[in-house]
Amino acid sequence: MQTRITRLLGLDHPLLQAGMSWASSSAALPAAVSAAGALGVIAAGPMYPEALRAAIRELRQLTAAAGCPSAPFAVNVPLYNKRAAELLDVVEAEQVPILIASQGGTRGHLARFQSQGVKWLHVVASALHARKAEDAGVDGVIAIGGEAGGHPAPDEVSAMVVVRAVLRAVRLPVIAGGGVADGAGIAAMLAL
């Protein structure tokens, strides 16, 4: 199935594995997701730069061993993190193809990554934040609702509501996040 997201990110399937702190701060889960044709995501939040570098390299080894040496993958960096600048340096040095930024503005980093061909997706919890991300020049947004793990919107509005509002507010490709855990949820989000 081809969508704006599959075309933008070079995926076979319009599915993205969330950056789930400790659950995806190692390479195994994101590598399996990427090898299956969706977007695997390494969660950099709980990591130190050296561990992130090792996870990126291991993911590449695992996807190559699975016969998918050029499988797209992403790293999620929470921009509020006190190590965010160091983590972004690792993402740049390791030539990660897709960066997912969350919990903060682009802070002057966006141009640096886009000039190298990196796709920048920004996690948003409202139409207002989506418009700000679009105005900053990001490549796409991940609209999350109250069902999302990590740091969802404080008002806990459903992803179905947030995603619809974001789709009306921006022209960017939009990925739905939060509470999408089975085929019915995927079908519902694709119908928006």
Give each language-model segment a name.
Residues M1-P173:
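Active-site entrance/lid segments in N-terminal catalytic domains of soluble metabolic enzymes
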Residues S21, L172-I186:
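Glycine-rich adenosine-cofactor-binding loop
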Residues A187-L192:
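A compact, surface-exposed functional segment
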